[in-house]
Amino acid sequence: MLFTAVWAIALLVQALTIASAVGTAGAAMLLPLLWIPLAMQVYARLKRAPGRPPTLLVLRVFQRDAQVQGLFDQVIERWRLSGNTVLIAGTDLADRTLDADDIFTFLDGGLAARFIRSAADVAPRLAALDLERDADGRFRVNECYCHDTTWQAALQALVGRSDVVLMDLRGFQAHNAGCRYELGTLASASRALRVVVLSDGQTDRAAAAQAIAHAAPGRFEWLDIARNGARERRAVLAALFG
């Protein structure tokens, strides 16, 4: 979209410049814009890897907005070039994941219909996830909107269809019951699953270790990430791509 906007502005300036001399014929300067969507579709097809793209599930300690947003900007955006991202919606990443479809749905009053109201809603909601590449070659971030009574069922379903999990436990403490449940669910998953866990000096590793004591050996890979620097970003991406 940004690429198209830049070219649109440049061509519009040229069209307006020559319009005084040739009149409406100056609009011909805008014709190259017709080729941009086609070219981007061809580019996306050429980049498409064979087989099913991997799915990344992102979990985190809520109310750690600044750290989670930094992680999203530096890591998740890079992952989107290779595979899908799914997460349980929260206000901490609203400005990172909001797209035009979300805005129009909200304005039309249809946002409530996206919420998972019962366990029976989980399968249809996951079946409706958009897992295709966009025209710019990136995969989308799909969110599941849940109530307090349904997020656990949604989590179990998301774990069942994810290939790798990124769990940001920076600042995690024993009283974070939701994170403890997530850790237990990941540890109990019957399918092959890689879990990359981020921690820092405030992470209660003992409480986390207790929650995953029954996990298969090697399932969890811990990374000490005290800040969102370039070296830390490379380490996280290397762990995700395995």
Language-model-detected regions and their locations in the chain:
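Structural alpha-helical scaffold elements that stabilize or flank donor/cofactor-binding regions
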Residues: 157-158
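Hydrophobic alpha-helical transmembrane segments
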Residues: 2-32
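Short beta-alpha junction loops
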Residues: 62-63, 90-97, 171, 189, ...
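IQ-motif-like calmodulin-binding regions
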Residues: 145
